[in-house]
Amino acid sequence: MKRLFATLLSLGLATAVFAAKAPTHHSMRGESMGNAHVAVVDDKEAIYYNYAGLSQINRLGNYAKRPEQGYYPRNFLGDARLNIGGAGPFETYFATYNVAKDLQVLYQNVADAAEALGMNQNELLMDTLSSHPELIHKINSYDHKYLPMKVKFDAELAIHGFGGAVWVDGSVAPYLDGGLILPFLGVDTFYVDGVVQGGFAYGFTDNFSVGIGAKAAKRHKVEVITIDILNYASIQDTLEDRYDDATHSIFDFESISFGLDFGVLYQLTREFRVGASLRDVYFKELAGDKITPNLSVGFNYSPRFFNKNTGYARKFNFACDFADALNSDRNYKPLSHLNFGLEVEQTLLAWPGYNNELRALSLRLAGGFKGGYPSAGVSLEVLRVVTLEFATWAEELGYYTGQDEERIYMGQISLGF
């Protein structure tokens, strides 16, 4: 085991000179509990956090195969799901949108007045702004404030020892800039990531397993788009054109990058396990970016007293990770790497005579801290076929935790079993 950890560390250090962030899958379950998941991985989330966790499917909660963890809710079938979701900082988005609309009306009125009076439009605009300082205050309040919006689609399959996924993650980050004379709308880094990945896990013992996976990733991005506020109505057409370019380019296979993921998992005691993973070890640049591998270590605690493996099953996990250890952008404050959280999942309606595998209604609540910022989430599963999920977390846009928070709200609908 020490040799495996040493191998993971040496691979990570050898690639620590890389700089950019890899395509990131946003797991609703993981993000809601602070993204501390490298040692939880008891279902399909092992595909994204630690392939070694695939060895736990149909083992946790299985008295015949692993009696020590028989108290844990069993996942006999694994997972096969289709997910679609979206996210954004909606509070700031709507506020900034209203400011932009107000400015559009103002500039259109100024343009009409300048034409009617035969005056210079810029001079009349400056006079108008000087007589309405509240508008300048509004502009300054949202000057270069990013408003990232995300969309995601996943197709996932996970069974004991094997898992794979095809997923797409897209993001656009519009902002309002005060400008030197005229404010304008900008879009910073419009991108679409497409990833196909799969891997397997092997349990050497009931307590120790390793996992390895491969992935192919494609990224298309547009760095900067600027739109004059006087032509604000054209932003929708412009973004649609950029989106069409991105979605067509995503199937250009010449620029696909291939990578590997590694993971280990060890059940230290009956209720306590530790895990480590080195993910996103790419062999070439991705859309011109050198990718920083993600080295994460963590633990998970599942107390027997709070877990219940019956028809009315209950799952309780507390987890803590030191995540993305090689990311130099987060090393100014070491605690920005610290993620921790807990989750409680309770079956509310069960089918008489059946165990947790066939349930009518299940509720999951989670909370935690990701890099110092609070996270939370809720999900409702109906007949094990339809799951509605919501999560919120924050990303740091500055150099250290607390400097510039970006609050994300994401919703998702999931179909499958």
Sequence positions of predicted segments:
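Generic cytosolic/nucleocytoplasmic N-terminal low-complexity/intrinsically disordered segments
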Residues: 1-2, 214
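Sec-dependent signal peptide recognition
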Residues: 2-10
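Hydrophobic h-region of N-terminal signal peptides that target proteins for export
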Residues: 10-18
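Subset of outer-membrane beta-barrel
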Residues: 20-417
